[in-house]
């Protein structure tokens, strides 16, 4: 093996970074890698090829050509290379023989493992997390999306900086103050920290604006419906046919990154806001979930979630579990959810229909967004769900509970108010069930009003 192969390291100096604060993060994606060696490790006797196939789709989504796929089986990751020494040498040989630009590993590597593989392969090594971050960087179109991706990239990069010899290491002090000056590593860490703080401040402003928009919709009594689901389940296609929008649709992972909001009128409910959001995936980088907090807030504070599922996917149950895990992480698992089984045209013996629970409430809709089949059933299920989730209550509060009254007015849910002879507030309110449950936890005395209403309605 030729050990003299030139190894190009892509770095950004402190000087470049000072001149352009985005240089360090944007330079992560500067080289255009076209040819890759894909590495996958099976950690069980049953070789599940679907994980590898999904990773190949991720690589395709990143616009990278796969030259070769190298697989191996292990019981546990090896500490130094993640794969064994022999397999690492095999990967290095493949890189040289096929003239690959990059090695893509379908697992999360420690910084040390990535550096060791880079050293033996003499090319850049990117793990699953890095690849997903790169795809997000390519797809981000809005200003907010670009800020969020940059923040996630910098957080990921901060753990992977290594010491390297530069001129800054040679700085010396005067008499009595001798010693090395600030190293390049220290400089990069400091500048990354500064840039992360800048991005967080900017995103806080964006988050405030989003929150104001949500408050405005809430005061106008406009429900928000958020599309969630595993990536490539057909959320954007469904969004387009429901709202006559023109959101980018493609048969690839993470085709949609920036959230889109459109008006959706629902009979007996009125105008709603439908939100198309980024898809989820197994092992979604935590840095991304954290960076996209303001975007995902649309999901957290929605009136209804439409969990879109690719019914033709053999791993749909695992995908649903992954989505539910992310929803729990962002604290959206308590939001009322309607399951939407999409792509029924790709399976046999399934017709468009609504599935109901024991209380005759819709829990799932089967449809094909691509063929416009079952969309009327979905709209009807949404109507029933939202009608059921909006509470109409009559509340009487003693004068000392003015704080509760103030909360109702803040939510703009008071339709009418009177004061009786005892000085009690008689409130006629219309409130989202989720908001009511939140208030009931804060003020337990409210629970009796909802229970009384449920009994009287039966």
Curated annotation (Swiss-Prot):
This is GTPase HflX. Residues 223-390 form the Hflx-type G domain. It comes from Histophilus somni (strain 129Pt). GO terms for cellular component: cytoplasm. GTP binds at residues 229-236, 254-258, 276-279, 342-345, 368-370. Its cofactor is Mg(2+). Belongs to the TRAFAC class OBG-HflX-like GTPase superfamily. HflX GTPase family. Gene3D superfamilies: 6.10.250.2860, GTPase HflX, N-terminal domain, P-loop containing nucleotide triphosphate hydrolases. Keywords: Cytoplasm, GTP-binding, Magnesium, Metal-binding, Nucleotide-binding.
């Amino acid at each position: 093996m030729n050990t003299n192969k030139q190894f190009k390291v892509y770095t950004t100096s402190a000087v470049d970074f000072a001149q352009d604060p985005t240089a360090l993060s944007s330079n992560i994606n500067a080289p255009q890698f076209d040819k890759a060696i894909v590495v996958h490790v099976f950690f069980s006797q049953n070789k599940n090829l679907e994980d590898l196939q999904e990773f190949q789709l991720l690589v395709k989504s990143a616009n990278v050509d796969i030259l070769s796929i190298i697989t191996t089986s292990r019981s546990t990751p090896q500490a130094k290379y993640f794969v064994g020494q022999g397999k690492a040498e095999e990967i290095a040989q493949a890189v040289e023989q096929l003239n690959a630009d990059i090695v893509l590993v379908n697992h999360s590597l420690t910084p040390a493992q990535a550096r060791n593989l880079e050293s033996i392969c003499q090319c850049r090594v990117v793990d699953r997390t890095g690849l997903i971050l790169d795809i997000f960087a390519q797809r981000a179109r809005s200003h907010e999306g670009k800020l969020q991706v940059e923040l996630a990239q910098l957080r990921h990069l901060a753990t992977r900086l290594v010491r390297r010899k530069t001129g800054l290491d040679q700085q010396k002090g005067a008499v009595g103050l001798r010693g090395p000056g600030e190293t390049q590593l220290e400089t990069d860490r400091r500048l990354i920290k500064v840039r992360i703080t800048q991005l967080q401040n900017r995103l806080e402003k964006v988050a405030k604006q989003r929150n104001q928009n949500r408050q405005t919709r809430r005061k106008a009594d406009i429900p928000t419906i958020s599309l969630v689901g595993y990536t490539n389940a057909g959320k954007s296609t469904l969004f387009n046919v429901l709202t006559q929008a023109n959101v980018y649709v493609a048969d690839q992972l993470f085709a949609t990154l920036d959230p889109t909001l459109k008006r959706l009128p629902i009979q007996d409910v009125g105008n709603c806001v439908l939100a198309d959001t980024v898809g989820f995936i197994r092992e979604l980088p935590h840095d991304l979930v954290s960076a996209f907090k303001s975007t995902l807030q649309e999901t957290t504070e929605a009136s209804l979630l439409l969990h879109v599922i690719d019914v033709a996917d053999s791993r749909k149950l695992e995908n649903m579990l992954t989505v539910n895990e992310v929803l729990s992480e962002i604290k959206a698992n308590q939001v009322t959810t309607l399951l939407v089984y999409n792509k029924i045209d790709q399976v046999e013996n399934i017709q468009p229909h609504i599935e109901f629970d024991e209380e005759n409430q819709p829990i799932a809709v089967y449809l094909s967004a691509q063929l416009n089949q079952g969309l009327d059933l979905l709209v009807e299920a949404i109507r029933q769900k939202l009608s059921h989730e909006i509470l109409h209550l009559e509340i009487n509060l003693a004068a000392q509970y003015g704080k509760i009254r103030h909360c109702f007015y803040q939510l703009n849910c008071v339709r009418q108010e009177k004061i009786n002879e005892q000085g009690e507030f008689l409130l006629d309110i219309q409130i989202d069930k989720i908001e009511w449950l939140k208030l009931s936890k804060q003020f337990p005395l409210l629970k009796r009003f909802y229970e009384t209403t449920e009994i009287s309605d039966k």
